Amino acid sequence: MAKQTNTLRIIAGEHRGRKLNFVDAPNLRPTPDRMRETLFNWLQPVIYDARCLDLFAGSGALGLEALSRGASGVVFVEKDAKAAQRLNENLQLLSYYNIKFQTKTDLTLFHGEPDLFY
C-alpha cells in the first residue's frame, strides 16, 4: 500500500493551484477545498488587505488561502511543534516572511492590550 501524501491546495489568488505538504498528525484535518472555497467566496469583498487570525492553524490552509487572496497579514497560532515547523516552511516557500507566528499553548497570547485588531 502506498503511503498517503498529506497535501493541501491553494484554491485561488496569487498562489492558485499550488500544492503544499503538511505533517501527518492524527488530529490534523485541514479544512476541505470545497468548504474553503465557499468560505472565501463569502469573504471575498473584505479579504483584500485584511488582517486575519488563524487559530489552531494546523496545516495553515485558511491563513494561506487568505494571504493568497490578498490579505495583508495573518497571525497563525499552532501549539504542535511539527505542524508549526511545516507551516513555517510553507510560508517561506511562498515567500511570506513577515507573518506573525505563535506557538503558545495557553491563553497568555490574549492577555493585555492587543497590538492588532481583527
Where are these regions (language model features)?
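Class I S-adenosyl-L-methionine-dependent methyltransferase catalytic core
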Residues: 1-118
